[in-house]
Amino acid sequence: MEEEMLIPEEEYQKSGVHIGTQVKSSDMKPYIFKIRNDGLYILDVKKTNSKLIAAGKMLARFDPQDILVVAQRQYAFRPVAKFAEVTGAVSITGRFNPGTLTNPSLKFYKEVKVIVVTDPLADVQAMKEAIKIGIPIIALCDANNKTDFVDLVIPTNNKGRRSLAVIYWLLAREILKNRGTITSYDQFKYTIDDFEAQI
């Protein structure tokens, strides 16, 4: 039985969620839909959709303050900050200071139980520390990402302004629905534009 699409397939595509990279890692092979004539790998949005549903269920089981979401990429700053505001999660955008998760004597130390990374490549310091302390890792992974140590892969264009807004908007909505904070999607009063980085 096919899972319900959180938004129409065309909406994922219009937002560029399916646009991968011209380099593919073997780890991401299961999430590739096709390769375009120009060599660009296209991601399977049905798998993106399915993984968002799974991530929403998983994250809803954690207390909000136990969820950390990180982003080094500038286009992800606003989506991540808005996601944190809407869900109550903790966010770090920009530089991830070494020791944030591993050194309790630091003033910026964070004690969390799960992490969401926007790009395993860009957010490598956060990844290393999450692995070291053994907390689950959810990662937005593009066609070129390695997925070692990632517990839940969300295959998506993790570089595009609109695609990042859509992914974090959907993930926030799914968490609130699974928590019972909202009982229907109509009650989610935020728009994708609220999550999108400004140019």
From Swiss-Prot:
Gene Ontology molecular function: structural constituent of ribosome
Keyword terms of this UniProt record: Ribonucleoprotein, Ribosomal protein
Keyword Glycoprotein (UniProt): no
SUPFAM superfamilies registered for this protein in UniProt: Ribosomal protein S2
Coiled-coil residue spans: none
GO biological process: translation
Cell inner membrane is among the record's keywords: no
Family: Belongs to the universal ribosomal protein uS2 family.
Domain of life: Archaea
Higher taxonomy: Archaea, Methanobacteriati, Thermoplasmatota, Thermoplasmata, Thermoplasmatales
Protein name: Small ribosomal subunit protein uS2
